[in-house]
Amino acid sequence: MLLRSKPALPPPLMLLLLGPLGPLSPGALPRPAQAQDVVDLDFFTQEPLHLVSPSFLSVTIDANLATDPRFLILLGSPKLRTLARGLSPAYLRFGGTKTDFLIFDPKKESTFEERSYWQSQVNQDICKYGSIPPDVEEKLRLEWPYQEQLLLREHYQKKFKNSTYSRSSVDVLYTFANCSGLDLIFGLNALLRTADLQWNSSNAQLLLDYCSSKGYNISWELGNEPNSFLKKADIFINGSQLGEDFIQLHKLLRKSTFKNAKLYGPDVGQPRRKTAKMLKSFLKAGGEVIDSVTWHHYYLNGRTATKEDFLNPDVLDIFISSVQKVFQVVESTRPGKKVWLGETSSAYGGGAPLLSDTFAAGFMWLDKLGLSARMGIEVVMRQVFFGAGNYHLVDENFDPLPDYWLSLLFKKLVGTKVLMASVQGSKRRKLRVYLHCTNTDNPRYKEGDLTLYAINLHNVTKYLRLPYPFSNKQVDKYLLRPLGPHGLLSKSVQLNGLTLKMVDDQTLPPLMEKPLRPGSSLGLPAFSYSFFVIRNAKVAACI
């Protein structure tokens, strides 16, 4: 059923109490709402368009963090675990370019930092009380900026060297995922090859044997962006060969305690012509053995991206055609196979400095989540939760950035049933709206409630009017705006005017709603994004 708004009088003058944005100067009062700033919405709520995973919003740890395994110990931070736990349920993908340059060495000795970490965990519940010894944490955090530069330089120069990691490294990674309530997906090295370019599975077998001995519950991938192996390693692997490699890995898993483990792939890059061709031949050869098709997407080159790019609906819409291409390939080869966005962020190459870690990045992130759900992608994995570059959710001091808070709100408010919302009229692209059933795990809400999330790329406030019969319902507003003089480039965020920050290392803040007067329009300030929960909506598709 398509539900349309009924005309009503424009809302009265509203005071913007949350600080200036866009054309409004400090202390200026906004002008009264003009007719063109009142926007009517249409909802389709008769049945869900799609059903996404409860782990729809998931995260990654880049494999380059293990280049020097000492830095994996940073994952032992209780604060980092608290932040990760806030996003559960979710997958934690350990992957990235370095996946194909990491070799497991079960005989490798633990580093001093690793030994210190494990010794400090003796006789205590590591998930509750585990922490990094203060001297070790201080040392690693002092050295991290230099290590980060090394990793980024290696990435830019495309000169990758093999690194080894130990049993201890695997233990640290698994412990972080397990204590955080995340399901680990581990990327195996696909560039280990025999003389005739068959995949050499011997190192993977060593890792499987070790993880099996520990009773670890892990899902698996093989390789990262195989479409660029020639550029990265001077090795060309076609899609058919890669499909055979996945069949070989599938057989290995079936012979081990991982016989019921999930296998995902092939983690190709953006679906340009050659990559789409590779994906098609891979799916024909090996698509039967994978549980979901994975691919990667970035909007921009991190070294050339601008703030204007982050706010440009033309840039946001590029994602739509990429999704369509992937689904065309999948439906022509393995119809019905689930599609995941296995790695994604705003800009490749580690993100865009002074942009990918600011409030401005949220426009891309929220829009990508909305479009992905609407178009049928089951899981979206955000690059990265913590690590090198500028696109992380949590910074080098373990402090959450704006996209973390946006992700946390999404987790708490947005359910798995995807509905349809649209803006009436022709000028829709700068005001982007998405609709789901509300997350019923949220104790504040109940089955039948709706969550609308909206992005305003206009330089004026827009007033959203809900369609009948929702126009007179109680609505809770969760408006996110940047804090401080840097505006859209701020790394701090306010929710309904209150600054979001952790209470302490073990405690996330309450996410306080702002109840709106029933029947009022939903004000969305210039260059902002917000969630609106429509209470007592009693939508049958959500029950």
From Swiss-Prot:
Keyword ATP-binding among UniProt keywords: no
Modification after translation: Proteolytically processed. The cleavage of the 65 kDa form leads to the generation of a linker peptide, and 8 kDa and 50 kDa products. The active form, the 8/50 kDa heterodimer, is resistant to degradation. Complete removal of the linker peptide appears to be a prerequisite to the complete activation of the enzyme. N-glycosylated. Glycosylation of the 50 kDa subunit appears to be essential for its solubility.
EC annotation from Swiss-Prot or TrEMBL: 3.2.1.166
Span list, region Required for heterodimerization with the heparanase 8 kDa subunit: 288-417
Lineage: Eukaryota, Metazoa, Chordata, Craniata, Vertebrata
Gene name for this UniProt entry: HPSE
Effect the entry attributes to changing residue 378 to A: No reduction in heparanase activity
Binding site for heparan sulfate group: 62-64, 97, 158-162, 270-280, 296, 303, 348-350, 389-391
Name of the protein in its database record: Heparanase
pH and activity: Optimum pH is 4-6.
Annotated effect of mutating residue 533 to R: Abolishes processing, secretion and enzyme activity
Glycosylation sites (chain numbering): 162, 178, 200, 217, 238, 459
Tissue expression notes: Highly expressed in placenta and spleen and weakly expressed in lymph node, thymus, peripheral blood leukocytes, bone marrow, endothelial cells, fetal liver and tumor tissues. Also expressed in hair follicles, specifically in both Henle's and Huxley's layers of inner the root sheath (IRS) at anagen phase.
